[in-house]
Structure formats: C-alpha cells, structure tokens
Amino acid sequence: MAQTRGNLFILSAPSGAGKSSLINALLKKHTDMKVSVSHTTRAKRPGEENGVHYHFVSTDEFKALITKDDFFEWAQVFDNYYGTSKQAIESQLDAGIDVFLDIDWQGAQQVRKIMPSVQTIFILPPSKAELEQRLNNRGQDSQEIIAGRMAQAQSETSHYNEYDFVIVNDDFDTALTDIETIVMAQRLTLKMQSVRHQSLLNSLLK
C-alpha cells in the first residue's frame, strides 16, 4: 500500500464554542492526526507550554518571520498576532499525517488561496446564551473582555458560509464524531484511494 500525503483541515469557531476541547479529544484518539502549533505574540496563560500549545514570540520576532515569508498564514486577532509555519505543515503532510489548523476566518481565507483543496470546518455553539455562559465559566476574563469576545463571536460567525462543513457543538461526543466522519470521508476520496491502492488497481485492470 503506497504512502499517501496527509489531508489539511481548518477548524474555526468563536471563542467558547469548544473547538480546543474537540481538537484535544480528537488527537488523543488518533495518533495519525496532529494540530499545527501556531506562533503567537499573546501572553502565555497558566498551564501553557512553549512549543506545545503555542510558539510564544515577541511582536518584533513575529514581524521578522512575516518578512521572511515563513508563515503559511498569519492574522491579527484583537491585539495579538497568530501564524502557522510553512515548514512544519508541509513536513507533516508529506509524512502522511492529517493536520488541523486551529485558525480564524482570516487565516482560512489565506490558506484557501495557497491550498484550495483544504477542507474547512466551522464549529458553532448551541446558542448565544450558552456561548456566554461558557466564557464566564472559564474564569479567565473580565466582563469587559467577555463582552468583547461576544461581539467578536458574532463577527466571526458571519463567515460560517465560507466553510465546507458546519458542526453545532451541542453534544460533545456527537460533535467529535462529526469531525471524525469528515476526516474519514476525505481519506476515501478517489484522489487518496487511487494513490493508496495503486498496486491493487493496476493488478485488477490488467
């Protein structure tokens, strides 16, 4: 069976929709899936590790990487920058690993221009009230910041129709299964299977 190149997926969601929890659960179940570790200029939160959750860099360092064209995509969110390393993504895809980009709609637009075959998924919360409750339950942000995140959530959600798939994270296990189904379907496309089973197809067609 021939080695196939991995698939690239984008997961986007408003803050509090449960995207990070879904990604973490997905990676625990599937060793052949990885999430890209982004570069960011935002401050490190309690429990976060450099190189594991993000590559934490200064604004000057980030801008230097932009100048060197080292990013697959980058965007400014609130007062911070986020970017995805080209080299890291390409090496994982070449190794047959399915890679997830945890990025917003701005980054998704940039990636589509470079790689039109990318599959994009938007995660929705079950309601606006539930989204606000989840943000409050984090206990990380002030009410002013939460209000800002709610306004940003509305702006981000307005781009849902730019995505290939939309999943409502009402029941966590169901949402996780939905993502797995999308990934498995991509692995069974004609393009992927014709490479993976080239020897079989050749023998059957002789």
Curated annotation (Swiss-Prot):
Family: Belongs to the guanylate kinase family.
GO MF entry, a single one: guanylate kinase activity
Gene3D superfamilies assigned: Guanylate Kinase phosphate binding domain, P-loop containing nucleotide triphosphate hydrolases
Keyword tags: ATP-binding, Cytoplasm, Kinase, Nucleotide-binding, Transferase
Regions that span the bilayer: none
Cellular component, GO, one term: cytosol
Kinase as UniProt keyword: yes
Residues binding ATP: A13, P14, S15, G16, A17, G18, K19, S20
Database matches in PROSITE patterns: GUANYLATE_KINASE_1, GUANYLATE_KINASE_2
Record function comment: Essential for recycling GMP and indirectly, cGMP.
Reactions mediated catalytically: GMP + ATP = GDP + ADP
Organism of provenance: Pseudoalteromonas translucida (strain TAC 125)
Full protein name: Guanylate kinase
EC number: 2.7.4.8
InterPro entries according to UniProt: GK/Ca_channel_bsu (IPR008145), Guanylate_kin-like_dom (IPR008144), Guanylate_kinase (IPR017665), Guanylate_kinase_CS (IPR020590), P-loop_NTPase (IPR027417)
Subcellular location field: Cytoplasm
Main location: cytoplasm
